[in-house]
Amino acid sequence: GLLEADDPAALSLDLEQLRADLKADPYFKNVPSFQPERGKTAVAFHAKDDLPEVRREVFKLLLRHAVKFYAEVRDMRAVLSYVRERNGRNGTYRYHPNELYDSSVARLFKNRLHQYESCRVCYAVRGSSDRTKSFADSLVLARDRFAKQWDKQVTTAIEVTAAQPVQQAGLQAVDYMLWALQRHYARQESRFLEMVWDKVSLIHAVDETDKAPYGVYYSKTKPLVGAALKNKVGI
């Protein structure tokens, strides 16, 4: 997922202020996730760990900011089918999760980068290895694919940095948007996504290929909530 913020500094300040206000609220005094040693809400917002009362406040805050959310949704059964097909053609092929991650990053940014002279991207650290170069390579691939498809010269300068969510509040914000999307698919619980749908620009369901080989694009004019939700779809 990608969250584009007009003023990331203001978003970070507001999230930090909200967290400080909640920590100072006696209502949360003895809540485990608010204890600093737990490394959860007391340190950074994380939708999976935060209380429902906290989630609602974070979502309300996001609605006040000029942000746009984009996401690529993959059906893991389709990914498994692809892996088996690759293994059938090449017995030495071994799937690695980074392969799916990198290809999703390239898809996600393909139609975004050309809109700007320069682009600063901060991504969340995953695991212990430094994947900044791999992430940057995926962005360059996305930029080049767009240029080739539309026969245009794209010279967008790309700056990539890695951070932990505790270091970059914008990563906490995109985590909330992804959590809302995941709840829709995994639990058919759509109220969170409906609440923030005004901030959603595009959701690409890559493997919903019944009507088109490239999948389905959901947007404000084609809402995801209310669309037929297949049991096989997952993220």
Predicted regions and their residues:
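Phosphate-ester processing/binding pockets and catalytic centers
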Residues: 1-235
